């Protein structure tokens, strides 16, 4: 038995399922999860001392690579001055100014401690600003585990085969309308049936919680137009796409200006940070300037702000955005080419520094229904084969994977060499 397996058994005695977030349990792929001891650059090292090329990146935050020296020193320096004050700091101003510089639609910003907190707060704000109760999301998209959002949710809920969660009252869920991603007609139908009642649309601009699904041409433009016509706010949930799809997020990549944006993951440089922000007139409704209450003991934590500030300043250096997208495209194209070589039907999607692949003979995968038609069992087999070859992909067919600036030619080439061997095994098994 490996040390990871031993630790997993031990963890289950005191931690539900042995993990502190469900997807980590490997339920989506089977087997025992790896317990990680340390990480550096593009590599993670498990409790047994084995190294893996990492394409999970702590589920997205590690865009510069693991254990980056500059971020590490920023954390140490901040920690030496105190871990938490519960009072304003100058670094919070610097951080807000930097985020607003990179994402201009965020004229004002409120820092929080997680992506879930950010989306939950943004939706409360949208309801308070518009005076409406209903919200619209998309099937297969995931916006955190707030009660009103666990309605046909993606990510962990899809991985576990549970489209909604027990414990969410029907009275909460009834205010959440669910449309079809990449289908504007479904959006229009819901607005027509709920005239003057919908406060906002919240959307992952690239759906990263049913693997990786970009918008079809005109989808986001259509959402913007519909929201303007109906007096609803458009919320881009950029917890995953922010600073990763492009330096200015998916909204910069697709040239769309949302009313509100939520951020997480990359913004903290590996520390627990989230944020929401947008038009000043909307953000002025947040307490203490407005009536919509939102608060947090650790919001704007000085150590977390220092990590995020260091991360974003490094990330915005010239050439980094293009370099990240280029190496991710190289990897995605390589997966597609190798699958074709071995006669394995595969759809590969990639935007900026995120990518995903689907074992399917469909020409495209553009919505949740398409995802459900993919070969999940084949994904599980491929995942474990790649793991055996030293490559750590997201342990779920419903999760996107991520590259970092620390992934160089050596890591990309080694990954594709492993994929070549793994596709060959799968092709042989299918004969």
Curated annotation (Swiss-Prot):
Which pathway does UniProt place it in? Porphyrin-containing compound metabolism; protoporphyrin-IX biosynthesis; 5-aminolevulinate from L-glutamyl-tRNA(Glu): step 2/2
CDD domains documented for this protein = OAT_like
What SUPFAM superfamilies would the database entry show?
Answer: PLP-dependent transferases
Q: Which positions does the record annotate as the modified residue N6-(pyridoxal phosphate)lysine?
A: 265
- Keyword Hydrolase belongs to the record: no
Keywords annotated in UniProt: Cytoplasm, Isomerase, Porphyrin biosynthesis, Pyridoxal phosphate
Query: Is Nucleotidyltransferase among this UniProt entry's keywords?
Result: no
Q: How does it assemble?
A: Homodimer.
Question: What is the official name of this protein in its record?
Answer: Glutamate-1-semialdehyde 2,1-aminomutase
| Organism of origin | Vibrio parahaemolyticus serotype O3:K6 (strain RIMD 2210633)
- What lineage is this protein's organism placed in? Bacteria, Pseudomonadati, Pseudomonadota, Gammaproteobacteria, Vibrionales
The protein's gene is named hemL
